[in-house]
A protein has these predicted regions:
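Flexible coil/turn and secondary-structure edge motifs
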Residues: 2-243
Length: 243
């Protein structure tokens, strides 16, 4: 399903994505140089994982524009829901317009609710570091620059923190990435869902230039690298409850 989204606040960042795809659309007047889509990195799974307990659990990841991160995890088997939103700042500044300034403390974040009997926290980390984003880019992802696009995991327990730190050390030791992993760990305090027009954006707008260039390759990589974890029908958010 595809729909046009007329949201002025999106244009600043999404125009950058449009510059990258302009040659594909036959728009030479937009043909300015941009960073090419980076290939995913095939990496080993975590040597350490959380114990599977309970009917559901949450993971809170930030890895650049939440459109692509949400779209990836919505297609992972065992994920029950993946909501785009903001973490790291206050409730008063948890809006797209304010977060894009880069001075609120917020990161564009995805809250992932998953079934631990079907997919583990470590398996979600595996996807996050491999195909969902580039963990070696400090305070940016592709064309999006600023601390709101930082690579961050919001940890909810000492056990989660230990698993993440061990995995980052494990991955750095492999030398598979072009540079050191810059992903930070922050204590989780609160998650604020993003505006409705951001939810399910990748699925609803597959021809949006930014999506075509920066996010659809992530979906293809997920299916290629993790075929046993890939689900063709995403777990969509739909309409958020009225606040």
């Amino acid at each position: 399903m595809s729909k046009a989204v007329a949201v002025p606040s999106l244009l600043r960042r999404r125009l950058i994505g449009g510059l990258a795809v302009a040659p594909l659309l036959g728009l030479p007047w937009l043909g300015l140089p941009t960073r090419a889509q980076e290939a995913p990195v095939v990496i080993p799974p975590p040597a350490r994982d959380l114990d599977a307990t309970g009917e559901s659990a949450r993971a809170i990841f930030a890895g650049g524009c939440f459109w692509g991160v949400q779209g990836v995890f919505q297609r992972v088997r065992g994920v029950l829901n993946a909501v785009s939103g903001y973490s790291g700042g206050s409730a008063e500044t948890a809006t797209y317009e304010l977060t894009t300034r880069g001075d609120t403390g917020h990161a564009e974040t995805v809250e992932i609710t998953y079934d631990p009997s079907q997919v583990s926290y470590g398996e979600l980390l595996h996807v996050f570091f491999s195909v969902a984003h580039n963990p070696t880019q400090l305070n940016y992802q592709g064309p999006d620059h600023g601390s709101q696009y930082r690579s961050t995991i919001f940890v909810q327990s000492a056990e989660e923190e230990a698993v993440v730190r061990d995995y980052i050390a494990q991955l750095d030791a492999t030398g598979l990435f072009e540079g050191p992993i810059v992903t930070t760990l922050e204590p989780f305090e609160a998650f604020y869902p993003a505006e409705q027009y951001h939810q399910d954006f990748l699925t609803l707008n597959p021809t949006w230039p930014y999506i075509v260039v920066h996010d659809l390759p992530k979906i293809a990589a997920l299916e290629s690298i993790f075929p046993d974890k890939f689900r063709a029908e995403p777990a969509l958010v739909g309409m958020l409850p009225a606040s």
